[in-house]
Structure formats: structure tokens, C-alpha cells
Amino acid sequence: MKLHRTTLAFAVAAALALPPAVMAQQPAPKPESKQGQNKGGLAQGDRKFVMEAAHGNMAEVELGKLAADKGASDAVKQFGKRMTDDHGKANGELKDFAEKKGLTLPADLDAKHKQLRDRLAKLNGADFDRAYANEMVKDHKKDVADFKREAKGAKDPDLKAWASKTLPTLEDHLKQAQDMQAQLKSAPRAAR
């Protein structure tokens, strides 16, 4: 009987000592993560949109300058000037937003837009005008779709408001680009 009590006492002591030892081996529970957040609290999807918008705005400014300089038609030159002005303004607003959220915007074009700029820079006259108009239609269709999606689904209310405010300008750019594209398609090609 004495052996039974000793065994029982040992078992109780072991049972009481075991939980702290097991707990010490388990990793501490992680605090609830804010998945997709950065230090400024911006959701990953919103952050991606901001970066893409910044690259797009920079590209529109650079390509607009190129169009204002190289464009053969007045329509292309004027559209290029508008792109420089409107997208320069939009990028300034986006920069202010990014600073408030602790984001650093890119300082230069991404590879895709550099390649586009370099390709267009090699063209002249009507060839440049048509290629530029085609790119502006393609880019603004994508921009309008992206801004509509962000105006409805952005997690950040300030970003949602900015996307909503900017969307009508982009829709107008798309309409103007389509008109310019149609005008250039109907213009006679120069003799080769």
C-alpha cells in the first residue's frame, strides 16, 4: 500500500509539472495578423493599385511629352499635352496619399513602360501618331477598368474617394483617345 501511495504521489507531481514544461516547448501564439497590410495599414490590393497607378501616371506623363514633341497631328500634340498635365496632377495627388500611408512611390518607369517609351521614340510622323493613339486607347481601357474596380472595392476610404474622383477624367481621356484613334485611321497614309 505504501508503494501505491508513493506511485500516486509521484504521478500527481509529474502531472502538475508536465503542463508548464509542455507549454514552454510550444511557440507563443502569434498576434492576429493584418494580412495584406503594410506599416501604413494599407491592404495589399490597395497597395498594388497605388503602385500600378503611379507607374501608369509616370508613363502617361513621359509618353505625353513624347507626343507633344514628336506628334505629326495637332490632335496628338494636344492630347499629349493634356496627358502630361492631367497625369502629372494625378501623380502629385497620389504622392500625397502615399506619404500619408507610409508608402514610397517608384521614382522611375517600370520595365514595361520603358520598353513602350523606347519603342514609340523610334517612330516618326503618322506612324508615331497611330502607335501612340493605339497605346492610349489600350492603356486607358485598362485604367478605367482598374479605377472602377478600386472606386467600388478599395479597402481604404481615402483611396476609394481618390479613385472615384479620378475616374471621370480617365473616362474622358479614353473617349478622346478613341476619337483620336478613329481620326488617324481615317486619315490617308503618306505615300511610301
Where are these regions (language model features)?
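His/Met- and acidic-residue-enriched segments that coordinate or traffic transition-metal cofactors
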Residues: 2-192
